[in-house]
Amino acid sequence: VILGFESFETANAYGQALGEQDGILKKLITTVEAPAPQTYFLRHRSLIPEGVSIAAVTIAPHALDAFYAFTSAFKAKVLLDTSRASAETMKGLPPNYELAWNHTTLRALRVDPAITYLQVRYGDEGALARAHRILAKYREELIGHHEFIRFNGRVEFAGLTLVRFTSEDRLNEIISDHEKMGAFVFNPHRYTLEEGGMKQTDAIQLAFKRENDPKGLLNPGKMIAFEDPNFDFASGQSYLFPGLEARAAAAQG
């Protein structure tokens, strides 16, 4: 099912509420901010009005009645229900899971090769409000995309925000500002475990690496702590594996 909402905020409020309905069996809750669905979901253009943000969900057939009873309390418009749509409507349409997670990013890239993305966690308390504040601040550069998940028994969401890329410096500014505003970015533009994740040494990972790959033959340069135990993660500088320094210098001319 694809539902339309007047704003990304209302789509997310719905996504959070639907995720918390344990009696409605579902597999996917994805929210995407306008104008991304209209611009990047090419096969769905005739179904999604301009300015409408969407929630793409996958609901078990036996739970559809309960799903619609729940959804009736929200200002949501049903744009597509594959259980009711005609064969003509369904012709050529991908399943909802191909609009979700990094499929969303890939569809955007097919239309605009300058698009990139960030992986964001917005904390616990006030996560939705925090996400909306960040998106509002960077309205010309960011487009919201959230995936609702169950984590440690709680319904949360992950941000796979679409970014209109202009420069590496600007991207780093946006990442830094996310963190100043209380969000945490798992940076997909870094190749090391630490920079792409928790930005600190994982002692268990490091011990496992030393035990099983003492000479560092597997994925060299992937773990900063193995190559440079004294690296300062607070410096704001990207780590460059020594074997790549010459190549990087050559690329910069």
Language-model regions: role of each:
Residues 1-30, 37-80:
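A conserved active-site cap/scaffold subdomain adjacent to cofactor or substrate pockets
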